[in-house]
């Protein structure tokens, strides 16, 4: 039985590519996504909005939405 997800994997890949292209350092943006995902995981451990959306995917979506804020991408 296949589970239906509430997000499109192609859209997630596109957003991740946009993050990588906007960043000056691929390693740094990867670490920032991982840190945000880890932080969100512990902050919202009890309040699960969408159990199918994992913290790294949520972090990619949030960070791609914040591309207009340069402090998110890096110095």
Curated annotation (Swiss-Prot):
One Pfam family in the UniProt entry: RNA_pol_Rpb6
Family matches, as InterPro entries: DNA-dir_RNA_pol_omega (IPR003716), Pol_omega/Rpo6/RPB6 (IPR006110), RPB6/omega-like_sf (IPR036161)
Positions of disulphide bridges: none
Molecular-function GO terms, alphabetical: DNA binding; DNA-directed RNA polymerase activity
Top-tier EC class: transferase
SUPFAM superfamilies: RPB6/omega subunit-like (SSF63562)
Function according to Swiss-Prot or TrEMBL: Promotes RNA polymerase assembly. Latches the N- and C-terminal regions of the beta' subunit thereby facilitating its interaction with the beta and alpha subunits.
Subunit description: In cyanobacteria the RNAP catalytic core is composed of 2 alpha, 1 beta, 1 beta', 1 gamma and 1 omega subunit. When a sigma factor is associated with the core the holoenzyme is formed, which can initiate transcription.
Family as reported in the entry's similarity comment: Belongs to the RNA polymerase subunit omega family.
Stored HAMAP family: RNApol_bact_RpoZ
Protein name from the UniProt record: DNA-directed RNA polymerase subunit omega
Species name: Picosynechococcus sp. (strain ATCC 27264 / PCC 7002 / PR-6)
UniProt gene name: rpoZ
């Amino acid at each position: 039985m296949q589970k239906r997800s509430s997000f499109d994997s192609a859209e997630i890949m596109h957003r991740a590519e946009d993050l990588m292209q906007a960043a000056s350092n691929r390693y740094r943006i990867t670490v920032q996504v991982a840190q945000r995902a880890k932080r969100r995981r512990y902050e919202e451990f009890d309040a699960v909005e969408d159990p199918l959306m994992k913290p790294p995917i949520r972090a990619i979506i949030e960070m791609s939405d914040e591309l207009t804020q340069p402090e998110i991408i890096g110095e």
